[in-house]
């Protein structure tokens, strides 16, 4: 499986090949009447359509006035380097384990030379002890030695927004709450929703 930063870079490069312009270090501070203003410059961009795809926290959707009624579940993931025998044993398949955490699940994804191991839970149903749950899950997987590790926490939107369009603004992907409600995977539906809105705008068919 590919690392997310590598995949994102590929998407950016492909978009640029088709004429997209990448603005870096450009934080949107306001959206009014289709005009985007930025926190670190006086530049303004007027857009006929604004597609908001800024992830689960989606600060831009708040600026656009979208109500956030998604259910967000907390999760933690470790990128771990393990001994060769453990990597060989656990890199043969993708794992989802529904008994890894109370009211949640765990996952173990093989990457090029390490494992991505994490857990996510319904915070309304269980006292959140993500680190403890993940460490226990790794032991259940038979991982007793970790050579190196890095951890990051995040939230996963497992229910969609009631409102996906507001004026000329559209939310897609995790910003819209399109993660799979069973396994909480978001990339597939993010790509599908992006493709759908792009085709609809290209066709001039906003009822799709």
Task: Show where each model-derived region lies.
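Conserved FAD-binding catalytic core of PHBH/FMO-like flavoproteins
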Residues: 57-130
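Conserved N-terminal helical subregion
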Residues: 1-63, 71-73
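Structural motif
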Residues: 35, 114-116, 168
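Fold-independent oxyanion-binding glycine-rich loops
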Residues: 26, 53-55, 99-101, 111, ...
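C-terminal helical "tail/cap" subdomain of flavin- and related membrane-associated enzymes
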Residues: 199-208
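Short, surface-exposed charged micro-motifs
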Residues: 30, 107, 168
């Amino acid at each position: 499986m590919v690392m997310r930063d590598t995949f994102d870079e590929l998407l950016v490069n492909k978009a640029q090949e088709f004429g997209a312009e990448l603005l870096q270090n450009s934080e949107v501070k306001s959206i009014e009447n289709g005009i985007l203003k930025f926190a670190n410059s006086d530049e303004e961009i007027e857009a006929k359509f604004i597609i908001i795809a800024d992830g689960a926290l989606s600060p831009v959707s708040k600026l656009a006035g979208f109500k956030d009624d998604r259910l967000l579940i907390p999760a933690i993931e470790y990128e771990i380097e393990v001994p060769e025998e453990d990597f060989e044993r656990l890199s043969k398949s993708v794992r989802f384990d529904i008994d890894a955490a109370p009211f949640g699940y765990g996952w173990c994804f093989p990457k090029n030379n390490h494992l991505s191991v994490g857990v996510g839970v319904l915070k309304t149903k269980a006292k959140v002890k993500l680190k403890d749950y993940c460490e226990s899950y790794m032991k259940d997987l038979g991982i007793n030695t970790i050579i190196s590790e890095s951890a990051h926490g995040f939230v996963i939107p497992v229910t969609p927004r009631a409102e996906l369009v507001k004026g000329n603004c559209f939310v897609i992907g995790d910003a819209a709450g399109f993660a799979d409600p069973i396994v909480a995977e978001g990339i597939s539906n993010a790509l599908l929703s992006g493709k759908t809105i792009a085709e609809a705008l290209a066709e001039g068919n906003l009822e799709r």
